[in-house]
Amino acid sequence: MSNLSGTDKSVILLMTIGEDRAAEVFKHLSTREVQALSTAMANVRQISNKQLTDVLSEFEQEAEQFAALNINANEYLRSVLVKALGEERASSLLEDILETRDTTSGIETLNFMEPQSAADLIRDEHPQIIATILVHLKRSQAADILALFDERLRHDVMLRIATFGGVQPAALAELTEVLNGLLDGQNLKRSKMGGVRTAAEIINLMKTQQEEAVITAVREFDGELAQKIIDEMFLFENLVDVDDRSIQRLLQEVDSESLLIALKGAEPPLREKFLRNMSQRAADILRDDLANRGPVRLSQVENEQKAILLIVRRLAETGEMVIGSGEDTYV
């Protein structure tokens, strides 16, 4: 079997367990893994009896060894923790460890569903549960799902995402029970997610009309919260992803001293982004100024960065800068 790779062995195993079981296995793999296995499977021509027997035999041996090691490891870990921490604290800690181990995939399945199917699956749940689910998804998937809700539900869920502080342990069991019915036993991660940054990242990926409506709805509830979301929606550091033509247009509007101070607090890739869009002479002068200018107060840096972002927004609103990604632009 030396000529068979791990992927080849996996393909052989998947082809022996039937379509339904293979589909269940695929649900627990990453997109890249599914792609690799699918490509290998499509290229299969013939599997000899010896190859099949060898693969199944190896799988059986490894499965038995893994199961035995897993049981012994858990028992060993419990014994060590009890001796170190006492029965009560050890039990609590072990429960957390095993729960984390068993729920690392979270509700990742929803990331690979069609947005319409995912939206249909969760739209009738309580808005807080929907918000809790969405903060665990890729931002683009969450935005696509939100776009399929009616406006009232979309605004309610986004407000809950913006004020989300994580799942409290007391509520975790109840929430998991609800989600088990929806997601075939998938559980939520405990890590703290959500909040203003998450809300901003999701809104950034929504269509302009929906974005404006959501911000308006949040502002009616809490003006300060809405402003925090707006402040997070496009950061100075995000300029590193803006196209060169837009950066060149921005440079026509920004004062050189303001840019110097703003870039004092920027990462090297962003500095280089600006420098390579300048004339050679202007870039050389700015490099010298950045190297020779002494320390600048953080408050000064932040003020200049905010001032530049105001220019960015103005140029984006007039269509002179493109600062979004994908089909939609942020205005």
UniProtKB/Swiss-Prot annotation:
Motif window: Part of the EHPQR-motif: 125-128
GO CC terms in record: bacterial-type flagellum basal body; plasma membrane
An example Gene Ontology biological process: bacterial-type flagellum-dependent cell motility
Bilayer topology: Peripheral membrane protein
InterPro entries the record matches: Flg_Motor_Flig, Flg_Motor_Flig_C, FliG_a-hlx, FliG_M, FliG_N
Keyword annotations: Bacterial flagellum, Cell inner membrane, Cell membrane, Chemotaxis, Flagellar rotation, Membrane
GO MF annotations in UniProt: cytoskeletal motor activity
Localisation: Cell inner membrane; Bacterial flagellum basal body
Residues carrying the site annotation Part of the EHPQR-motif: 160
Top-rank lineage group of the source organism: Bacteria
Cited NCBIfam families: fliG
Main function: FliG is one of three proteins (FliG, FliN, FliM) that forms the rotor-mounted switch complex (C ring), located at the base of the basal body. This complex interacts with the CheY and CheZ chemotaxis proteins, in addition to contacting components of the motor that determine the direction of flagellar rotation.
Similarity-based family: Belongs to the FliG family.
Official protein name in the record: Flagellar motor switch protein FliG
The organism of origin for this protein: Salmonella typhimurium (strain LT2 / SGSC1412 / ATCC 700720)
